[in-house]
From Swiss-Prot:
Homodimer. One of its GO terms (biological process) is nitrogen fixation. The gene is nifH. The modification ADP-ribosylarginine is found at R97. This is Nitrogenase iron protein. Keywords: 4Fe-4S, ADP-ribosylation, ATP-binding, Iron, Iron-sulfur, Metal-binding, Nitrogen fixation, Nucleotide-binding, Oxidoreductase.
């Protein structure tokens, strides 16, 4: 079983990219569980066709300790297992702590047991804030592979570089490795070349460049992944390609994060900063 965490700055398209990639993997016959680690609890919406899923933390609050696996796990597109950790009430408590509680509960309830025959577990994690809780999937060995969703925008690259600092730190003492950057295009000038160069400087790869296409929004409005909503569209093939590249990826590295100066020099070199 491969345990993969998808990180990236808020609003970059992590949840969309994760769910569309998972749709590509299950279409290939892989058995996948998705664990949403974002307080917004929108990491499985497209796989579940918009059914609002009760989060692990809400279930624990309502039911106490007497929780069964089926109370927190729903079956989505092509039998994908879907879980949302959820978060505390706004302004109270720590969202990162919720992730820790959720993953521990899933382990106790046997979600990862051999009889589930999972090929993949995906953690979709809020990534601007690399606080202890959000870093938990990579800190405590819950995920061995990380993919960072970014774009050619300055803040997306800044967040990606910060996430690499975490992987660098925990990779030295554990098993976590960076599998690559996924560029979710924002149509920035020279974007593919810049993210390719950024990846090279980090010591990794841009595993795929996902072009911007309105079909993604059309599918989301219909509460589906592109592969589910428009399987013959070229954008569906982009996600199939990304899924296949992840499925075959063997390049796992401890990244070397850039200094702020190096990052700014890269942005200036590609004309993003003056």
């Amino acid at each position: 079983m491969r345990k993969i965490a998808i990180y990236g700055k808020g609003g970059i398209g992590k949840s969309t990219t994760t769910q569309n990639t998972v749709a590509g993997l299950v279409e290939m016959g892989r058995k996948v569980m998705v664990v949403g680690c974002d307080p917004k609890a929108d990491s499985t919406r497209l796989l579940l066709h918009g059914l609002a899923q009760k989060t692990v933390l809400d279930t624990l609050r309502d039911e106490g300790e007497d929780v069964e696996l089926e109370d927190v796990m729903k079956k989505g597109f092509k039998d994908t297992s879907c879980v949302e950790s959820g978060g505390p009430e706004p302004g109270v408590g720590c969202a990162g702590r919720g992730i820790i509680t959720s993953i521990n509960l899933l382990e106790q309830l046997g979600a990862y047991d051999d009889d589930k025959q999972l090929d993949y577990v995906f953690y979709d994690v809020l990534g601007d804030v690399v606080c202890g809780g959000f870093a938990m999937p990579i800190r405590d060995g819950k995920a061995q592979e990380v993919y960072i969703v970014c774009s050619g925008e300055m803040m997306a690259m800044y967040a990606a570089n910060n996430i690499c600092k975490s992987i660098h730190k925990f990779g030295k003492v554990g098993d976590v490795r960076l599998g690559g950057l996924i560029c979710n295009s924002r149509k920035v000038d020279n974007e593919a070349n810049m993210i390719g160069e950024f990846a090279k400087k980090l010591g990794t790869q841009m595993i795929h460049f996902v072009p911007r296409d309105n079909m993604v929004q059309h599918a989301e409005i219909n509460r589906k992944t592109v592969i589910d909503y428009a399987p013959d569209h070229s954008q569906a093939d982009e996600y199939r390609t990304l899924a296949s590249k992840i499925d075959n990826n063997t390049m796992m590295v401890i990244p070397n994060p850039l200094s702020i100066q190096e990052l700014e020099d890269l942005l200036i070199g590609f004309g993003i900063m003056n």
